[in-house]
Amino acid sequence: MDLEYFKQWVLKEFNIDLSAYKANQLHRRILSLMSRVGVNSVEEYIQLLKKDESQRQKFLDFVTINVSEFFRNPEIFEDLKYKIKEELLIKNRILKVWSAACSIGAEPYSLAIILDSLSPNINHKIIATDIDSTILERAKKGEYTYSEIKNVKKEYLDKYFKIEGDKYIINSRIKNMVSFKKHDLILEPYEKDFDLIVCRNVVIYFNQDVKDEIYKKFSSSLKKGGLLFVGATESIYNYKDYGFEKASTFIYRKV
């Protein structure tokens, strides 16, 4: 399989740099995608992606890792809530928060719920970004299935959602706390002066050089004392190299 040719085509077609991904994992997953649709060569797969919109979206879902749910790993979110209350809200009345690679919006809305529960009626600034325009449109709607909200506490469910049929719809108060925008973690610059950056279960897919660059840029984007919250499989072993200290198992503080 001519993976380099495919990478170049994807970069030109979608402006997505697949060289950032772990090579063996990328190779296996692309072969899996190809086998599912019955094509045997990169050229055939490219032709399919050019003409079949549903397959283009499946490929983009694979690349942008669109798997998410509210309060994923609830006990870790409880730890984050404690840190927000005891550290961030003491120093700043209004917080600036970034949910990076936010997928369907469950993560930034989870953050909005936490902030509203801790400091009601304060207009914290939550920026939620993703590389996938289609998934951002879904996130803006704020409509979810039971499997996506299953970790939401009953008190939050009653207060922040309404149920219509099999849909759970986030209320306008929480929705209005989040601003969604398209952003590429690898290719585009980062905003500054964040109190909290949340990026979970994404960096694990990238090679080490790209990980290093992303963590350095996250550190640069945080205020001193700001927090980086990562996924349950993403411990940063060399966190000191990026200007962090460990605040807890999956939370790092900029020094």
Regions found by a protein language model. Name each.
Residues D2-L95:
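Conserved AdoMet
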Residues L80, I197, L222:
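Residue-level signal for inorganic ion chemistry
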Residues N92-G105, H124-I127:
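Conserved class I S-adenosyl-L-methionine
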Residues I104-S119:
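Conserved SAM-binding loop of SAM-dependent methyltransferases across substrates and taxa
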Residues H124-V198, V202-V210, S235-Y237, R253-V255:
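Extended basic-aromatic, gly/pro-enriched interface segments that bind polyanionic ligands
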Residues D212-K224:
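A short glycine-rich, Lys/Arg-flanked "PGG" loop and its adjoining helix->strand segment in the class I
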Residues G225-A232:
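Conserved beta-strand signature within the Rossmann-like core of class I S-adenosyl-L-methionine
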Residues A247-I251:
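Short hydrophobic/aromatic beta-strand or adjacent loop that forms the aromatic wall/cage
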